[in-house]
Amino acid sequence: DRLRSRGLGDVYKRQMERTLNWLDRCAKAHGREEQMLFPIIQGNFFARLREESAKATIPYAKCGIAVGGLSVGEPASLMYEMLDVLQPLYPENMPRYLMGVGTPDYIIEGVLRGIDMFDCVLPTRIARNGTAMTSKGKVVVRNACYKEDFSPLDENCDCYCCKNFSKAYLRHLVNCNEIEAAMLLSIHNVNFLLKLTENIRTAIAEDRLGEFRENFYRDYYNKGVN
């Protein structure tokens, strides 16, 4: 059960309890050692329910813990508030997985709040719509300004797309509805997020995650950190 909007607390409590009942049945049925089972913390946007769900869910966690029901249209500040509630409760020796999150800012803010893993259709979905994520922000490739731009999507990227194709050629593919456009932009966008998480790991190891966050927001979103 993905809990999507604010409302009466008892309604969401029943939904959370239904999820916990399913988790118990799933754990009892799960017998494949080669398959990982990540129990999912729910609770809508109520701190009390999130805490209750976490405390009931964590005992089932053997290899990792997931957080669901966030990034479903709520303000970013509300998602961050729920992650702040959960951060002290996670097991320290297991990865934490935030479901359905794929924008660079959500990834960075999630890491700052104890998250290790993310998944999302975003990089391939926006690729199908002709949009690329770059070190200087989003590039809408179909725009006319790229008609005679023979530079790569991102001067700082070493992916197959950036090494071999220009913005002008990619724009041609997008505007002709060629499937290669979605393929090449997907390669680039996935590589961009892999490089982002690699850079985050390096910043953590060098104890400069705050500085990295500030610089990334300035370059990608053309704004400072709120």
Where are these regions (language model features)?
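Generic structural signal for well-ordered, non-membrane alpha-helical segments
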Residues: 16-19, 50, 79, 163, ...
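Structural signal for well-ordered, non-membrane alpha-helices
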Residues: 20-27, 87, 198-201
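Glycine-rich tight-turn/loop motif centered on a GG-T
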Residues: 10-17, 70-76
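C-terminal extensions of enzymes
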Residues: 154-226
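Glycine- and acidic
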Residues: 10, 64-71, 179-182
